[in-house]
């Protein structure tokens, strides 16, 4: 199954119980959920590695008898065109100090990430989900403008950790086949404590 494009990326900060932090000050919003979209000029790339563990061949009687497979260790190289400044800093653990500054406070906070793409042939939605991990920003390049702008995208690395809701695995893939898939159920698994928005009665 081939996939094409990036439809969107959603992130949230999570607590020690892998529950979304529903607080605009301590988390990313009142609901805890932050959808990266047109206001951030969208996601450019979300390159996922480590979906399978490394393998070691097992030999016996001068023959290859088996393969021992390690655990998956996913990481996402995530590039956003213009991620909200405060959101970016909160995700990597730089918290506002009330004086216009942002400084690292303790350990890097844990976060969750959901990447949406679609199939080539029939445009069915596919989601790569990470319910627990840490976000880092290893570097920041700054360059002079010439006759052209020199832009530096927001480039972050998400390192996935074990997620309880995924049966102890580090990631889960969802496929919107139009029958079994329920988006609210997916959101509740990926973002622990998520509640679907209520549409006011007319």
Where are these regions (language model features)?
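Short helix-loop boundary/capping segments
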Residues: 104-138, 143
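Oligomerization/assembly interface segments of phage tail-like spikes and tubes
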Residues: 63-87, 150-163
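N-terminal, charged/glycine-rich beta-strand/loop interface patches
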Residues: 44-66, 70-76
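Mixed-charge, glycine-accented linear interaction segment located at domain edges/termini
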Residues: 133-202
């Amino acid at each position: 199954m081939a996939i094409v494009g990036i439809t969107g990326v959603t992130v949230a900060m999570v607590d020690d119980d892998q529950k979304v932090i529903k607080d605009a000050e301590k988390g990313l919003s009142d609901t805890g959920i932050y959808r990266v979209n047109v206001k951030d000029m969208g996601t450019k790339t979300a390159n996922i590695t480590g979906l399978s563990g490394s393998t070691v061949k097992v030999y016996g009687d001068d023959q290859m008898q088996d393969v021992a497979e390690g655990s998956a260790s996913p990481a996402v190289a995530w590039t956003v065109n213009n991620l909200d400044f405060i959101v970016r800093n909160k995700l990597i653990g730089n918290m506002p100090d009330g004086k216009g500054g942002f400084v690292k406070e303790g350990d890097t906070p844990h976060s969750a990430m959901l990447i949406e793409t679609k199939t080539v042939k029939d445009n069915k939605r596919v989601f790569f989900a990470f319910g627990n991990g840490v976000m880092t920003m290893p570097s920041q390049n700054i360059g002079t403008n010439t006759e052209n702008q020199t832009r530096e995208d927001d480039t972050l690395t998400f390192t996935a950790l074990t997620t309880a809701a995924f049966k102890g695995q580090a990631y889960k893939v969802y496929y919107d086949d139009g029958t079994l898939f329920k988006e609210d159920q997916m959101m509740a698994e990926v973002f622990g404590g998520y509640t679907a928005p209520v549409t006011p009665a007319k």
